């Protein structure tokens, strides 16, 4: 029943994170829509000389329809994202350098849980498990969070037409689910950190960025001080 569903949602966390391989850090940045994942991934990739893995969003042909009618288009939307992210990770597995990604493939299950009915979510989860059973997973995760008003402001600033219809309840649910996922990983001893960015601007403010950098460096085996 619901207990099994909740347990299954987080079952990957135990399998996904082993010991951090310091000679090839693989950082994933996660959090709700508009929190600053891509911006931080870009800065970290420049700082560390890592390959920047960017999530493909605009190319999803179902996305604008999805926000118009979530129930009708959710399965197609989530499957497109899952297959694209699977291919992206496959493409970077042979890289010899560190990687910083603005997503973790597990986000598919977080979003799908909120948009699919029970039958579709079960079907989606089985496909997800098959695709992810043998792919390389991040060994370091940074969870970003921010207050609802901050998220809405940042979403408005980037002016993506299909995001203008996102409702407050949807964002609040994502915030809650990301926090639950973070807690589950933390309890499993994973290499994770959570940063509230409501009062921080790590894009324009170097002091804020340096504070984040000082938290991230020990996670990937680098000295805290430059």
Protein language model regions, located:
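P-loop (Walker A) phosphate-binding loop of NTP-binding proteins
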Residues: 32
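NTP-dependent small-molecule kinase module
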Residues: 156-165, 169-226
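Post-Walker A alpha-helix
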Residues: 40-41
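Short, small-residue-biased leader/transition segments that mark boundaries at the very start
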Residues: 1-6
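A glycine- and Lys/Arg-enriched "phosphate-lid" helix/loop adjacent to the NTP-binding pocket
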Residues: 110-177
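Glycine-rich phosphate-binding loop used to anchor ATP phosphates in small-molecule kinases
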Residues: 73, 77-135
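Conserved lysine of the Walker
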Residues: 37
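Conserved substrate/cofactor phosphate-moiety recognition/catalytic segment
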Residues: 46-84
């Amino acid at each position: 029943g619901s207990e099994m569903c909740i347990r299954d949602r987080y079952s990957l966390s135990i399998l996904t994170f082993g010991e951090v391989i310091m000679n090839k850090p693989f950082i994933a940045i996660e959090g709700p829509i508009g929190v600053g994942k891509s911006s931080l991934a870009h800065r970290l990739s420049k700082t560390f000389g890592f390959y920047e893995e960017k999530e493909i969003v605009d190319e999803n042909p179902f996305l604008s329809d999805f926000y118009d009618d979530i129930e009708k288009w959710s399965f197609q939307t989530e499957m497109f994202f899952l297959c694209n992210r699977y291919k992206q990770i496959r493409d970077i597995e042979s890289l010899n350098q560190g990687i910083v990604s603005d997503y973790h493939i597990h986000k598919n299950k977080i979003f799908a849980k909120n948009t699919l009915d029970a039958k579709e979510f079960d079907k989606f989860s089985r496909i997800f498990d098959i695709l992810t059973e043998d792919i390389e997973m991040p060994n370091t995760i940074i969870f970003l969070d921010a207050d609802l008003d901050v998220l809405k402001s940042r979403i408005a600033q980037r002016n993506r037409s299909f995001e203008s219809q996102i409702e407050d309840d949807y964002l609040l649910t994502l915030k809650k689910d990301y926090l639950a996922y973070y807690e589950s990983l933390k309890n499993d001893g994973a290499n994770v950190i959570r940063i509230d960015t409501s009062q921080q601007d790590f894009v324009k403010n170097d002091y804020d960025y340096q504070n984040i950098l000082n938290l991230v460096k020990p996670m990937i085996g680098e000295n805290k001080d430059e």
